[in-house]
Structure formats: C-alpha cells, structure tokens
Design a protein with these regions (language model features):
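Beta-lactam-recognizing serine transpeptidase/beta-lactamase-like catalytic domain environment
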Residues: 2-123
Length: 123
C-alpha cells in the first residue's frame, strides 16, 4: 500500500471496479468477495480488503516499487531483538528473483498481483 501511494502512481481517490476477479495474462485472480465489491477507492479497498483493488493498484505501482518498500520496512531482515535461532527471511520481488532465488527468470504481471496482496513464491 505504501509503495502505491508514496511513489505517486496511485491517488487515493482513484476508483477501481471489482467484478470479483482480475485477469492478468492467461490467469484469473479471484477476489475473496466472489460477487465483487463494485467500485472501490483507496479507503474502501482497504476497509473491504478487496484483492482486485490491490491487484490493479499493485500493477500500476509496479513490482519493483513494492519490493523497494518491502526492504524499506525491514521485511526479510532479522529483527535484532535477540531471538534464538532467528534467520533473515525472504523478500519476494523482481530484483530478488534475478539474484537470490532458485527460480530465476522473468517477472510477470501475475507475480505483481500476488505481491500486491502479500502472497507469492518462497525460496
């Protein structure tokens, strides 16, 4: 969400229509609300946890921007609070796919859709 607003690619008043799914490439990504939420802006997208809103806004922001904010928020890093056995986590994104994962390759819109709702590949 921060990546979408802070980089200026999304305005909170922008409306997205949610029919209950979003198609990216040859894949259909569903919203938890099968009937759809209809028109959603930023606040209603968050309040209703509308997957389609975040798929579309995530694609507008781009996978690189979302990954940048994952790192800014410290995701994938140790907490530094002394947890025994703690290891760093995995940051999912286009740059990480190029450098750190076994599944190196192209980044697709479907990957950004997953990333925009906090889902995606694990190493």
């Amino acid at each position: 969400a921060a990546a979408m607003l802070n980089d200026g690619k999304v305005d909170p008043s922008d409306k997205v229509y949610c029919p209950g799914y979003y198609e990216a490439g040859n894949r259909r990504f569903g919203c938890w609300e099968k009937k759809g939420h209809k028109y959603m802006d930023w606040l209603s997208g968050i309040a209703n946890s509308c997957d389609v809103y975040f798929y579309r806004m995530g694609l507008r922001a781009g996978g690189e921007a979302i990954e940048k904010y994952e790192k800014k928020f410290g995701l994938g890093q140790r907490t530094r609070i002394g947890l025994p056995g703690e290891r760093r986590g995995h940051v999912f994104g286009p740059e990480n796919r190029k450098t750190e994962t076994k599944r190196q390759g192209s980044w697709h819109d479907g990957d950004t859709c997953n990333l925009a709702i906090g889902q995606g590949e694990l190493p």
